[in-house]
Amino acid sequence: MSKLTTGSFSIEDLESVQITINNVIGAAKEAADEKAKDLGPMGPSAWPGLATYRDDWNLKLLDRYEPVITPMCDQCCYCTYGPCDLSNNKRGACGIDMLGHNGREFFLRVITGTACHAAHGRHLLDHLIEVFGEDLPLKLGQSDVLTPNITITTGQRPMTLGEIKPAMEHTEEQLTQLLATVHAGQESAEIDYDSKALFSGSLDHVGMEISDIVQIAALDFPKADPEAPLIEMGVGTIDKEKPFLCVIGHNVGGVTYMMDYMEEHDLTGKMELGGLCCTAIDLTRYKEADRRAPYTKVIGSMSQELKIIRSGLPDVIVVDEQCVRGDIVPEAQKLGIPVIASNAKIMYGLPNRDEQDVDATIEELKSGAIPGAVILDYDKLGEISVRLTQEMHPLREAAGLRKIASDEQMKEWVDKCADCGSCYLVCPEELEIPEAMKHAKEGDYSYLVDLHDQCIGCRRCEQVCKKEIPILSVIEKASQKVIAEEKGWMRAGRGQVSDAEIRAEGLNLVMGTTPGIIAIIGCPNYGDGAKSVYYIAEEFLKRNFIVVGTGCGAMDMGMYKDENGQTLYERFPGGFQSGGLVNIGSCVSNAHITGAAQKVAGIFGGRTMEGNLAEIADYVLNRVGACGLAWGAFSQKASSIGTGCNIYGIPAVLGPHSSKYRRALISKNYDDEKWKVYDARSGEEMAIPPAPEFLLITAETWQEAIPMMAKACIRPSDNSMGRSIKLTHWMELHQKYIGGMPEDWWKFIRTEADLPLAKRAELMKKLEEEHGWEIDWKRKKIISGPKIKFDVSAQPTNLKRLCKGA
């Protein structure tokens, strides 16, 4: 009897047939395991479970980078025993303490983010297999290492859409196991919640990788293209005379049908299609592999959602999933904007119109009989959204709904202000709204204009205003001239970093001569406005760091211009190279950032990638200078993305609001025992500098964050030239933004060649006078003093099993 492993079959016109079905669910994994036998060397951790990485890697990280807990309150309200007071080392009725409770709270946010990306990947994978078939090849650019995160986790190297399914199933299976641990009466140790969070973070990067590679392959996105087209950005790029279809969310699956309908009916020049959040980024990637002239627009990040609705410009809004405001329907309804929900994860209580005739649905929405509809049938979605936009435009124009308030209405709002200060007290950014309103009463709106860029559009101020002033609308009305000029450029998301780019830059990164990789990712919950991200990126680009971006961070970097009127994307090349600005893509493209570091270990370092997370992460931690920045992190996805970076040894700096995630990972840089590793050549212990000194930390200002990130790119394996370059940048940036010399700069000196060249003599004098080091001034050499010996051939590792003779 033949055995069916995967695929499908049909039986017709047969009698007395017996069908035996055994392990259907595991069939895909069995087939993948059979194929894996031909792949070559395999690491020890393929198909990991909750405990797989715990002792071999996670606890080693957590021993050096100890969790620092920042509780939001002293109570646990998790079950009906509670609420329980956990202050002063008390335990709850179930036995859990404050550490365990907060470990669980942080972990819950990480697995929520992981589930969000995994569900995104599952939706796209199933949809694209249905459309293109399982045999569609994964063409992602000129690379052999196509799926580093999948390969490290499962040991597999999928080459088609269908071959991704086992990795998807494994991620979903482990998410179920992880979710089970948050139930009352399960895990209670904070350290094990942290270990599980790290594991969940690694799975998050698998889910993101699946999400992006399937859409790159099937939807003809740019494929590791450093010259991907430049895309127009900003509200000012929207032609107000044309119908405007606005899309919001992260899943581009349905949007491609709108674009297809527009192209088939020659409408691309007759109406505007633009978006917010990552759907905006991905719609500008659709069919851009051949660098065709783009016609879609990026409006901005999540902080712009309510602002664009209040402007009255959208004629129809289509939402899909993730980072979409919960008040879009009532806000849009005030201005006669129909809302279409195109994904089952956000349905807003709207009626489903999948089974209704297209014309009837358009008429129902156009008449205002319903505020919106759920349309999950993508063919209908494409037609209805485009046609409805064209029909709504003249109706809303005639009704005066496509513009913000009149000057008279503005004056009436401003004059109502009682200067009570309630708006200031609830503003998460502590904006000086009362002060701005006071000046506005005197006819000076400039103070309101200054608030526009810093305002995150949350509307908390409006909800406490006793005079019911629509404060966000007041700010936006005052800023109309500025908004009309909001025009930037962003390079379309290019996808992965190619193997060739890794080979070209790998040596420079490992030796330290390219100072490091700065990854600017995450949400727009900035403490001081979006321009801070621009300043940070510009500073590192001018210093020849590689700056990579995704999502809201990638958008906001492109919204500001220099004195010559150029954006960063116009000023700097798009390749993964020293001084390059690389827009990887949307949020799910973050997997390619960790993937780039993993490729350095696999391609340049020659490490086995298959099922070998600990060894790859160990290589990155000790050798690859990289630091992430999630300056406006707000979501659960941001916590899972950052935690996935952390397990691979990549530190991340978060903005001032991020202490609300409840956990940081910070080392004791003064404890020499924490800064010892093995030399793989002999197995002997060797001292290393405290680098990087954190894995997850918050900064109060962008000026504080910059030197912190430069320092976080120092690695134990830097050669002398690389160490000198990195110390030069760190010390100069510390002087520029903090003032003075860093207190611990001397800990990173192994030999006089490590010292910044321009200040070598001055620093040697400080080492002699302030730290008691012995200097031979005739030869200008350090004779004694450093605790760390320099050996260019040393092989630092945290894993005893990698040592010779182990």
Curated annotation (Swiss-Prot):
Stated EC number for the protein is 1.2.7.4
Q: How is the cofactor bound?
A: Binds 7 [4Fe-4S] clusters per heterotetramer. Binds 2 [Ni-4Fe-4S] clusters per heterotetramer.
Q: Name one GO biological process term.
A: acetyl-CoA metabolic process
Keyword Cytoplasm listed: no
Q: Where is the 4Fe-4S ferredoxin-type domain?
A: 407-436, 445-475
Q: Does the keyword Thylakoid apply?
A: no
Positions of [Ni-4Fe-4S] cluster binding: H250, C278, C323, C523, C552, C587
What catalytic activity does the UniProt entry give for this protein?
A: CO + 2 oxidized [2Fe-2S]-[ferredoxin] + H2O = 2 reduced [2Fe-2S]-[ferredoxin] + CO2 + 2 H(+)
Quote the record's binding site residues for CO: H117
Q: Which Pfam families match?
A: Prismane
Amino-acid positions noted as binding [4Fe-4S] cluster 4 in the UniProt annotation, renumbered to this chain: C427, C455, C458, C461
Binding positions ([4Fe-4S] cluster 2): C76, C79, C84, C94
The UniProt entry, under SUPFAM superfamilies, shows: alpha-helical ferredoxin, Prismane protein-like
Pathway membership: One-carbon metabolism; methanogenesis from acetate
**Keywords of this protein's UniProt record, alphabetized?**
4Fe-4S, Iron, Iron-sulfur, Metal-binding, Methanogenesis, Nickel, Oxidoreductase, Repeat
A Gene Ontology molecular function term for this protein is: 4 iron, 4 sulfur cluster binding
EC category: oxidoreductase
Q: Which cofactor does it need?
A: [4Fe-4S] cluster; [Ni-4Fe-4S] cluster
* Comment on protein domains: Cluster B is an all-cysteinyl-liganded 4Fe-4S cluster; cluster C is a mixed Ni-Fe-S cluster which is the active site of CO oxidation. Cluster D is also an all-cysteinyl-liganded 4Fe-4S cluster that bridges the two subunits of the CODH dimer. Contains two additional 4Fe-4S clusters, dubbed E and F, that probably transport electrons from ferredoxin to the B cluster.
Q: How does it associate, per the subunit comment?
A: Heterotetramer of two alpha and two epsilon subunits. The ACDS complex is made up of alpha, epsilon, beta, gamma and delta subunits with a probable stoichiometry of (alpha(2)epsilon(2))(4)-beta(8)-(gamma(1)delta(1))(8).
List the NCBIfam families hit by this protein, alphabetically.
cdhA (TIGR00314)
User: What family does the Swiss-Prot or TrEMBL record give for this protein?
Assistant: Belongs to the Ni-containing carbon monoxide dehydrogenase family.
- What is this protein's function? Part of the ACDS complex that catalyzes the reversible cleavage of acetyl-CoA, allowing growth on acetate as sole source of carbon and energy. The alpha-epsilon subcomponent functions as a carbon monoxide dehydrogenase.
Q: Which protein is depicted?
A: Acetyl-CoA decarbonylase/synthase complex subunit alpha 1
Annotated organism of origin = Methanosarcina thermophila
